[in-house]
Amino acid sequence: EKPLAPCEKQVKELFDKAKENHVYLMEAFAYQHSPYITAIKKEIEDGTIGEVRYIDSAFITSDYNKENIRMRRETLGGCTYDLGVYSTSLTLGLLNEEPAKVEASAIFSEEKIDKLTFVVMEFADGKKAAFTCGMTFATDQDRRLDRLEIDGTKGSITGTKFSFNGD
């Protein structure tokens, strides 16, 4: 389950162990293989929207009760580890580069996990990306918000029914 590990050192150890045992190790983000994402990647590669300049996304769900694994600090709970990884992997996958600068701001719960996080990424060539992730809708509501907007020099792609589930 995401994240693969809490720090780079542990991720490297996992990859070393996988290599030593001749097995594959990967994070299983189903959405990356969905027809929706495949079509978006093709539009970008074909230059339909020109050069990508800005990506904005959001993934917000209902809150969870305090017993849920997503709400416990010792199990790497919080919205960034649970939800923000989708926007991060999506942005990096679409832009095919690492950010030069990342800034984030979060609101934390009594359990000291982030419940709402805002992240801004700046890339060396001037591209920018931002995302919001959160577990803020009322616990008794089965709600979620998935949003994606990609702005290019010749147009944009907007998804208001975007799903990080791979639908």
Tell me what each language-model feature is.
Residues E1, L25-E27, D56, F131, ...:
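Hydrophobic residues in well-ordered beta-strands that form the structural core
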Residues E1-Q32:
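Beta-strand-loop-alpha-helix segment that lines the small-molecule cofactor/substrate pocket
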Residues D16-Y24, T38-R53, E149-G152:
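Basic phosphate/pyrophosphate-binding loop/patch that engages nucleotide-derived ligands
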Residues Y31-E110:
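Predominantly a Rossmann-like dinucleotide-binding segment in NAD(P)-dependent oxidoreductases
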Residues S89-G166:
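Contiguous beta-strand/loop segments that form the cofactor/metal-binding neighborhood of enzyme cores
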